[in-house]
Amino acid sequence: ADTVALLKKLRFNYLAMPAADAAGITAIKDYLEKARKSLDAFGKAIFYKPDTEADSQRIIELDGCENLKLNFTGTEESYTGAEYTCRIAGILAGLSDTISATYTKLDEIVSCDILEDPDAAADAGHLIPLFKNGEYKLGRAVNSLTTLTDGVTADFQKIRIVSTLDLIAEDIVTTFRDSYVGKYVND
């Protein structure tokens, strides 16, 4: 509850909470989905292998980062997958809306246990690192959405699509609230 109360006061695009427990993840997911529906917030959260499948456009489930060794400063150090969610949040927040995160280089990874079936992981709504052509890269940039409907197609599983839609919606809502509401007569 304290986390959600704090989130209501912040404006963010991507949130990483390495220490979040199952109840916290559920509370954050519920808040993000409700806030998006009411056009109050447009954020997304990244978690490492949450206990329950989120099945949400708002949640990115990082997976496949066991025995992770990273080198950020010239020294190799061990990190948990949960700690690495912060780096992924930074990557996603820093990308242009014209670029997908798929195959983004992860130069800091020295070694990592890679999942054997990256397509199955992506189809299950998991964002994973890959090792291709001698380099670590992000796999298919997907969120945790797996349940598709007539109005929610496979396009909504792509991080870039959801982020672009959120950017457009947030710009429209912000412009309306800041430049029109209370400034013009409604006849």
Put a short name on every predicted segment.
Residues 4-184:
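A glycine- and small-residue-enriched flexible loop/hinge signal that marks low-structured segments
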